């Protein structure tokens, strides 16, 4: 008895079963089998990152040090996220703390004044190494996060009694965080980070600076926080999934392209130099066999004499009748020689278009616009430039919120705790919670960095004015977009107005015109209202 076979339904290609063809193609062999050899393993982020972690960061370091585009990408992050001054805008959660809004504002003014004196001291007392102000530390942290994927800051205590505040900070390179004695990873110790069963960091193993290399390497274990809740070691990175222990640098997705672009540029430059090096060549009628006899057979005395004699004859001839290209003399060559002029060839040969394509790919991977990365703003309209700047601005604002502000806020909390203990600033007496009970509420703050790039200053100002007049924005938000604090702007305007009045100066013409226009409009509205009544 014959067993009947059920026919298999095939897809449009006539080879793949219809069941497989109707599913997600990404998990199959693809059309024509293009994906059949693509079988990446399914790994956790630590399994994919940590085995080659040191080498990947070393390559990123090399790119930033020796590649102009990579260095520019880091500079863009520093300039657009932090800028020249990272300004504190302290705003405690006064409703939660049970204090009045005016009390909270008065407390914030005291805190901001004391913090600025401590953080931006020219003597750099905030830094253990006495090299950085607070803004410089934030800029370094942003750069560190950009090309290493994470940043580390150690909160320390100055034992000397020469200064009011003892709180200090040390920037720690990610290269110094590693397992003791370079041992392998374990379940609770990965890449220098000791974690609990839930994945929370308990402490970090920090090695001493190994330079110049002959000194024995030592590791120190530093807890992530002290028993009282004070941060001891600040670690900031953006995890992409659960269980991630260390941060991945942003260059991983474009590292190969950046390195190949660097090699391509060097090769293109060498090619251009070689093509421009020779204006003309003199070709001799000496055949290949004779030339090889001269060159390869020069070990014998006879061949050396023949080669020396031949070169001597040529040198003597052209010494008596030199060949010149820049003069008016028409050269008369040695019999059998020919002069060939080398025309300059196009050294580009489609290279610029190919370079732009690579740079667009790299810019997309780094989160910046092509124009900012390449510094090429040619052939751009205002709308195109504005759209490109807004895309990058959204990326930079995310990094400011989750990287720079997190680092700054944790450093600020360490200082604020000491400032309260030393009574440099005094908590409102009617507060519901103490500092230890509500650290986040007392230390809640925003950070104002560099302003958004203005493509057209006039249009940017008009937009801000219209948003405020329409009630869709506030002076605080619009000033923050420009990198300014609205309270400082208002206070300065009041001082300038009073000084101009005392000096007998009239208000600016535009201010007077705006005031008269507003007064005229208000009068007309009142008249129309009275008529309607």
Give the location of each predicted region.
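Short coil/turn segments at secondary-structure boundaries
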Residues: 155-157, 273-279, 373-377, 477-482, ...
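Charge-rich, acidic-biased intrinsically disordered regions
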Residues: 39, 132-138, 155-172, 287-300, ...
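Short, Φ-rich (hydrophobic/aromatic) sequence segments
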Residues: 67-98, 137-146, 251-271, 280, ...
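Activation/maturation switch segments at domain boundaries
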Residues: 2-3, 337-348, 390, 458-533
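Structured, mid-chain assembly/scaffold modules that mediate subunit interfaces
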Residues: 76-239, 467
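N-terminal-proximal low-complexity accessory segments that begin disordered
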Residues: 1-101, 531-533
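Extended, charged amphipathic alpha-helical segments
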Residues: 233-388
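Surface-exposed loop-to-helix/strand elements on domain peripheries
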Residues: 128, 328-455
């Amino acid at each position: 008895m014959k067993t009947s076979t059920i026919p298999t339904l095939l897809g449009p290609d006539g080879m793949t079963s219809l069941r497989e063809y109707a599913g997600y193609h990404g998990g199959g062999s693809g059309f024509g089998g293009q994906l059949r050899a693509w079988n990446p393993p399914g790994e956790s982020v630590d399994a994919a990152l940590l085995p080659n972690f040191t080498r990947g960061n070393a390559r990123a370091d090399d790119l930033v040090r020796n590649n102009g585009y990579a260095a520019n990408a880091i500079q863009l992050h520093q300039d657009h996220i932090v800028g020249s001054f990272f300004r504190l805008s302290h705003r405690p959660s006064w409703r939660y703390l049970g204090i009045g809004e005016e009390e909270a504002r008065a407390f914030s003014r005291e805190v901001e004044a004391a913090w600025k004196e401590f953080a931006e001291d020219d003597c750099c007392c905030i830094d253990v190494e006495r090299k950085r102000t607070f803004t410089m530390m934030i800029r370094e942290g942003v750069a560190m996060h950009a090309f290493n994927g994470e940043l580390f800051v150690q909160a320390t205590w100055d034992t000397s009694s020469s200064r009011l505040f003892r709180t200090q900070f040390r920037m720690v390179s990610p290269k110094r965080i590693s397992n003791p004695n370079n041992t392998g990873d374990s379940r609770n110790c990965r890449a220098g980070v000791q974690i609990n069963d839930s994945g929370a960091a308990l402490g970090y193993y920090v090695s001493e600076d190994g330079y110049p290399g002959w000194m024995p390497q030592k590791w120190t274990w530093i807890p992530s926080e002290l028993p009282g809740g004070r941060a001891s070691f600040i670690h900031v990175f953006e995890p992409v999934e659960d269980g991630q222990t260390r941060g991945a640098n942003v260059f991983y997705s474009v590292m190969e392209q950046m390195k190949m672009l660097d090699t391509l540029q060097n090769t293109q430059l060498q090619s251009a130099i070689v093509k421009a090096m020779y204006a003309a060549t003199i070709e001799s009628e000496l055949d290949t066999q004779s030339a090889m006899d001269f060159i390869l057979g020069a070990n014998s005395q006879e061949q050396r004499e023949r080669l020396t004699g031949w070169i001597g004859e040529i040198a003597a001839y052209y010494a008596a009748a030199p060949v010149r290209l820049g003069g008016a003399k028409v050269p008369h060559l040695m019999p059998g020689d020919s002069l060939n002029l080398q025309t300059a060839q196009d050294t580009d040969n489609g290279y610029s278009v190919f370079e732009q394509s690579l740079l667009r790919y790299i810019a997309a991977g780094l989160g910046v616009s092509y124009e900012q990365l390449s510094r090429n703003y040619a052939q751009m309209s205002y709308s195109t430039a504005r759209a490109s700047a807004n895309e990058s601005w959204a990326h930079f604002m995310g990094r400011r919120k989750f990287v720079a502000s997190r680092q700054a806020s944790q450093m600020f909390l360490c200082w604020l705790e000491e400032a309260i203990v030393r009574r440099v600033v005094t908590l409102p007496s009617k507060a519901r919670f103490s500092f230890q009970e509500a650290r986040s509420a007392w230390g809640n703050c925003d950070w104002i960095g560099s302003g958004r790039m203005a493509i057209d200053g006039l249009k940017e100002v008009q937009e801000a004015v219209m948003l405020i007049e329409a009630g869709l924005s506030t002076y605080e938000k619009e000033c923050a977009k420009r990198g300014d604090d609205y309270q400082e702007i208002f206070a300065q305007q009041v001082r300038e107005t009073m000084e101009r009045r005392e000096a007998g100066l009239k208000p600016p013409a535009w201010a007077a015109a705006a005031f008269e226009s507003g007064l005229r409009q208000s009068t007309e509205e009142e008249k129309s209202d009275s008529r309607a009544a």
